[in-house]
Design a protein with these regions (language model features):
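AAA+/SF3 P-loop NTPase mechanochemical coupling elements
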Residues: 213-218, 253-272, 326
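Conserved P-loop NTPase/AAA+ ATPase motor core
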Residues: 351-455
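Pre-Walker A (Motif I) flank of P-loop NTPase domains
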Residues: 146-152, 216-218, 267, 426
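Walker A/P-loop
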Residues: 148-182, 211, 242, 246
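Conserved C-terminal "switch" segment of AAA+ ATPases
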Residues: 61-69, 104-106, 214, 275-353, ...
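AAA+/P-loop NTPase substrate/partner-engagement loops
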Residues: 172-202, 209, 229, 299
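Conserved catalytic/switch belt of AAA+ P-loop NTPases
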Residues: 222-262, 266
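Extended, charged alpha-helical coiled-coil/arm scaffolds that mediate oligomerization and mechanical coupling
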Residues: 1-144
């Protein structure tokens, strides 16, 4: 009897539990149907235009299973918000950003080395080291088929064409080109992005520029990397760049806004700098340094003839006439020597533009204009020369010697004069802003004279 009672109780418990489970399932189904109907009434159901559009675009994306899973999860979250709420807008913008990024999309490289060399030589005069390095990279890429991009840093004085070289490299390889200026960057979030919990959150500038390029392997110029502010109240941007510029890490770059990893390993990063001393050592170690030195006068003349003068003639509207203005070699040399003081050609370009503007003004007034610009016309076009170089014309004066000086804009000569005065101490007085080496040279010269005065 006791066993029979236990069996009946067990059957009753099973029957009760089964009924409860069925009731719970029916309740969940009923609630799900209610939620679905309410969403459809509000225009936010699975059939809403916004969701359909996002799902359609997502189906075409070439992304990994992890990213697809994250996208679906975030897409489901969208249904939880009211379309009029700020949260809905934030979530929708995030999903649009994910859709807009070129996940796994690469432009096909043109690895014709002769064509690339021709483009680089046409666009830029000199810069043999840089051109050689880019062509080597293309050659290895052609042989291997797959290669992590090098991280190159071009350093040198302003105006030598470091930034513009990036466009030529992109054209030579048929890649997209993007440029990001780092001058004055003081917030780490500019690199890594803001977390979505913040109002007005957005991805970092690295991800935004990749989105702008529409390709995951563009030529990416990081301009003025030596001007990045370090150790600020908003973090250290130079430390944030370590992940971007490390070939071992940038295959999984983490942006705070996206909150998923993005592959930057195929991006050809080219940084530019004027002074390496202001770049942190860990950042320098991750980059391949290539010096772009200043130009000598002969090189500047060639650059002016090939690039600057034709471009400025077009900018000033003087290319529409049959007779275009021409500069003689001596005229260009005079502009370089007496109107500019630089390693690059930026000031030279400005002076050429100024001269051509004067010619355009005279033409507009129907005045007579000499189309051939010689050294004699330069002062009339550019005004009085602000710089004059010392010229060695022989030296027969006792107590005057010629010295050689090195400056950032090239070599100089200088005249060092001495004079004797009566006295018992034999004191040496130096004038001018001299460095320690110059002072030591003067002391050695005096001691030499003392040692050999009686011989």
């Amino acid at each position: 009897l006791h066993k029979e009672i236990q069996l009946l109780e067990l059957k009753q418990n099973i029957r009760t539990k089964t009924r409860e489970d069925l009731d719970e399932q029916q309740r969940e189904y009923f609630l799900q149907q209610q939620i679905k109907n309410i969403k459809e009434e509000l225009g936010r159901g699975e059939g809403s235009p916004e969701r359909k559009e996002l799902e359609l675009k997502a189906a075409k994306k070439n992304w990994s299973e992890d990213i697809a899973k994250t996208f679906r999860k975030e897409l489901d979250k969208l249904d939880m918000f009211n379309p009029q709420s700020p949260e809905y807008s934030i979530q929708f913008n995030y999903l649009q950003t994910m859709i807009a990024l070129p996940w796994g999309e690469y432009t096909k490289d043109n690895l014709d080395l002769k064509r690339a060399q021709r483009i680089l030589n046409h666009d830029h005069y000199g810069m043999e080291k840089v051109k050689e390095r880019i062509l080597e990279y293309m050659a290895v890429l052609k042989l291997r088929g797959d290669l992590k991009s090098p991280i190159i840093c071009l350093y040198g004085p302003p105006g030598v064409g470091k930034t513009s070289l990036g466009k030529s490299i992109a054209a030579a390889m048929k890649r997209k080109y993007v440029r990001m200026s780092l001058g004055g960057l003081h917030d780490e979030s500019e690199i890594r992005g803001h977390r979505r919990t913040y109002v007005g959150a957005m991805p970092g500038r690295i991800i935004k520029n990749i989105q702008k390029a529409g390709s995951s392997n563009p030529v990416f110029i990081l301009d003025e990397i030596d001007k990045v502010t370090q150790n600020t109240i908003n973090g250290d941007p130079s430390s944030a760049l370590l992940e971007v510029l490390d070939p071992e890490q940038n295959s999984a770059f983490h942006d705070n806004y996206l909150d998923v990893d993005y592959d930057l390993s195929k991006v050809l990063f080219i940084a530019t700098a004027n002074d390496l001393n202001t770049i942190p050592r860990p950042l320098l170690d991750r980059m391949e340094l290539i010096e772009v030195s200043g130009y000598i006068t002969e090189e500047k003349i060639e650059i002016a003839k090939r690039h600057l003068i034709p471009r400025e003639i077009e900018n000033c509207g003087l290319d529409k006439n049959e007779e275009k203005p021409t500069f003689t070699k001596a005229a260009i040399e005079r502009i370089i020597e007496q109107y500019t003081r630089e390693s690059g050609v930026r000031q030279l370009e400005k002076q050429v533009n100024k001269a051509l503007r004067k010619i355009a003004y005279k033409k507009a007034l129907d005045s007579d204009v000499n189309e051939k610009i010689t050294p004699n016309e330069i002062e009339g076009l550019l005004g009085k020369a602000p710089f004059y170089r010392d010229i060695y014309q022989g030296n027969s004066y006792a107590g005057v010697v010629t010295g050689l000086a090195w400056t950032s804009v090239g070599g100089e000569i200088l005249f060092i004069e001495t004079s004797l005065s009566k006295g018992k101490t034999g004191k040496l007085t130096l004038t001018g802003n001299l460095g320690d080496v110059m002072k030591e040279s003067a002391v050695i010269a005096l001691e030499y004279v003392k040692a050999h005065i009686d011989t």
